[in-house]
């Protein structure tokens, strides 16, 4: 006679074991119709699963995050159902959920085309609209293996052989004649899986191992209703338009080439943006009382062995040899900063010591993971390390948080997700040390009025950390900033200070990054602004153009005035119609276009237009210079005439 406790605290008693669906039906027909699965004692279970003892139960519907994930997982099975009907000889591998969708890896004797994807999608919809029931059956290990052996599903057999104990009773999900194996849960009926889109096919090695066979990975997205799907596809279209790789090429910001994979060739305009970001961050370093340093980009293997990087990070490090010594190109800046700290005796009076560097780092990322500026091998970190005493941690973290938000707000990022990662199983240090460190980070976040998500056990082995993720205009999340406590590295590299009692003590080190990789951050803001950089960041802030040759000298005078004021300006004296010039510079996303005709010369003015098409009328040259300088100085996000 199980007693089921519902989320509102109410209880229902049943005379016999009862399924999740039957509990939903006892509450109401509407809830039963919406039921996808249940959370029994906090564990996700299928709607058909039986509850035989007292338990808590939450019904999962399409409105829940878990419900949407289950819809996506079941849509992956629906894809398997359709593939087996259209390509009976295909072998199915794995089909998990991912962010916003799912994929299925398959072994097929020919490459899939876009026409194949269209046909698969049509068959999936045809099957889903029959609203068939998904039937779950628990079977013995041997019965599961016999089932897949009879169907020639060698990858499913391998999963059973290598990953599932022979004592287990795996769950087989029956989609009419199609059978798949999964931990579940899955939807009880395919009426929940009507809103999906197959997106692309890519290659993927079985088990992620390049020694294994290359399979075809079919990616798809699935949503709870038609509007959610349409909104997501619209965001994808917008993301494609904003792709920093396309915009970077169109605006001549940078390029990459095969001879230097994952390394950026910055062109003049892209490098201008890069240097402006550095200049901006430098103003903040001064404001928040940091020293700026510069360490070598390559150091002896001996040092990296001391830090543990050689043993734990070796695959991602580029190495070289000289005069019988082995060196590693630095993947991060922290060991170098400790070397600087160790030069000369440090007293407690010297702490906190805040050390920052625009450090050039290299990591040997797999070639398949490289993606424009977002994932590179050579990058520059706006890195800092703060050496402090334990009692200074909370105040220093508070200062870091303020700096993070100060910088992000300048770029218009207001929606920032904050996560606190706590002690992992493989941590070093005492319980007391960790408890205080986690409490200090939480207290700093709370003192700043920040809501945060706790990620249990997700901290580094050497200390807890705070992560800051930016949510952009397309609702994508970009993890950029980190504040990481480190009890480990300073001790390993013999960092110490003389405490007030004259004892030698090891400082706490706080790793702090805000932009993260400057290259990646440029990719992020290129997509956020769609290449319409605010005036202070724009490589060219204004173009001055003539209507006829008679205004050429005046144009040059205006250009000199703007240039002398420290503004980035160009002249366009080509023998082209002014409309053609305006269109061209609009496509180049130049913030302001200044047109000089005879009337403007007579009045000592310029006619001002913006890249968004606003006609701002005429300005005295001095007025425009002051207006633009004010915008640049204030790092304003919008141009004149923009709301």
Curated annotation (Swiss-Prot):
Domain of life of the native organism: Bacteria
Residues in TGS domain copies: 1-61
Presence of the UniProt keyword Nucleotide-binding in the record: yes
GO terms, biological process: threonyl-tRNA aminoacylation
GO CC, one annotated term: cytosol
GO molecular function, one term: tRNA binding
Spans annotated as Catalytic: 243-534
Pfam families from the UniProt entry: HGTP_anticodon, TGS, tRNA-synt_2b, tRNA_SAD
Claim: 4Fe-4S is one of the keywords in the record: no
Predominant location category: cytoplasm
UniProt-annotated binding residues for Zn(2+): 334, 385, 511
Entry's EC annotation: 6.1.1.3
Cofactor(s) the protein requires to work: Zn(2+)
HAMAP family per UniProt: Thr_tRNA_synth
Function of the protein: Catalyzes the attachment of threonine to tRNA(Thr) in a two-step reaction: L-threonine is first activated by ATP to form Thr-AMP and then transferred to the acceptor end of tRNA(Thr). Also edits incorrectly charged L-seryl-tRNA(Thr).
Quaternary context: Homodimer.
Protein name, per record: Threonine--tRNA ligase
């Amino acid at each position: 006679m199980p007693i089921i406790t519902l989320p509102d605290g109410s209880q229902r008693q049943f005379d016999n074991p009862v399924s999740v669906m039957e509990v939903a039906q006892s509450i109401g027909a509407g809830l039963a119709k919406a039921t996808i699965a249940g959370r029994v004692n906090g564990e996700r279970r299928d709607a058909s699963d039986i509850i035989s003892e007292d338990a808590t139960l939450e019904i999962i519907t399409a409105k829940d995050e878990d419900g949407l994930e289950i819809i996506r997982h079941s849509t992956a099975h629906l894809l398997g159902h359709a593939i087996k009907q259209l390509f009976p000889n295909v072998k199915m591998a794995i089909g998990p959920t991912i962010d916003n969708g799912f994929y299925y890896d398959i072994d097929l004797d020919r490459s899939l085309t876009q026409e194949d994807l269209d046909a698969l999608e049509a068959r999936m919809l045809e099957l889903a609209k029959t609203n068939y029931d998904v039937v779950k059956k628990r079977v013995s290990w041997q019965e599961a293996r016999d089932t897949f052996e009879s169907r020639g599903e060698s990858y499913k057999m391998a999963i059973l052989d290598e990953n599932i104990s022979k004592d287990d009773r795996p769950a087989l999900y029956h989609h009419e004649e199609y059978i798949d194996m999964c931990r579940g849960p899955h939807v009880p009926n395919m009426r929940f899986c009507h809103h999906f889109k197959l997106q692309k096919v890519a290659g993927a090695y079985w088990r992620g191992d390049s020694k294994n066979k290359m399979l075809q990975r079919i990616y798809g997205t699935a949503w709870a209703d038609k509007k959610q799907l349409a909104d997501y596809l619209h965001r994808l279209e917008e993301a494609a338009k904003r792709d920093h790789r396309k915009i970077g090429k169109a605006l001549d910001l940078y390029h990459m080439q095969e001879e230097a994979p994952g390394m950026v060739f910055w062109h003049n305009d892209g490098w201008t943006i890069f240097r402006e970001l550095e200049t901006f961050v430098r103003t903040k370093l001064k404001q928040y009382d940091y020293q700026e340093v510069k360490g070598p980009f390559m150091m002896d293997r001996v040092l990296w062995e001391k830090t543990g990087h050689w043993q734990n990070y070796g695959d991602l490090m580029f190495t070289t040899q000289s005069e019988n010594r082995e060196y590693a190109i630095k993947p991060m800046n922290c060991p170098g900063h400790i070397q600087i700290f160790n030069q000369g005796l440090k007293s407690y009076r010297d702490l906190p010591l805040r050390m920052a560097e625009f450090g050039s780092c290299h990591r040997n990322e797999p070639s398949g993971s490289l993606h424009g500026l977002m994932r590179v091998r050579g990058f520059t970190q706006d890195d800092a390390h703060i050496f402090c005493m334990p009692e200074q941690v909370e105040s220093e973290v508070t200062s870091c948080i303020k700096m993070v938000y100060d910088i992000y707000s300048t770029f218009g990022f207001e929606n920032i997700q904050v996560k606190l990662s706590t002690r992992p199983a493989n941590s070093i240090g005492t319980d007391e040390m960790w408890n205080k460190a986690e409490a200090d980070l939480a207290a700093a976040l709370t003192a700043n009025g920040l809501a945060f998500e706790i990620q249990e056990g997700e901290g580094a082995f050497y200390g807890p950390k705070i992560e800051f993720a930016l949510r952009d205009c397309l609702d994508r999340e970009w993890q950029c900033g980190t504040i990481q406590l480190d009890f480990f590295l300073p001790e390993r590299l013999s960092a110490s200070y003389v405490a007030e009692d004259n004892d030698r003590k090891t400082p706490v080190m706080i790793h702090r990054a805000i932009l993260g990789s400057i290259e990646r951050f440029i990719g992020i803001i290129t997509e956020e602004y769609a290449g319409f950089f605010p005036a202070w960041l724009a490589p060219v802030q204004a173009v001055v153009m003539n209507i006829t040759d008679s205004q050429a000298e005046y144009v040059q005078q205006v250009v000199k005035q703007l240039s002398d004021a420290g503004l980035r300006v160009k002249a366009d004296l080509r023998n082209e119609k002014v409309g053609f010039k305006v269109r061209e510079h609009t496509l180049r996303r130049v913030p302001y276009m200044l047109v000089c005709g005879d009337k403007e010369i007579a009045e000592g003015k310029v006619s001002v237009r913006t890249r968004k098409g606003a006609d701002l009328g005429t300005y005295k040259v001095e007025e425009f210079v002051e207006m633009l300088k004010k915008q640049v100085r204030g790092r304003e996000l919008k141009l004149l005439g923009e709301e």
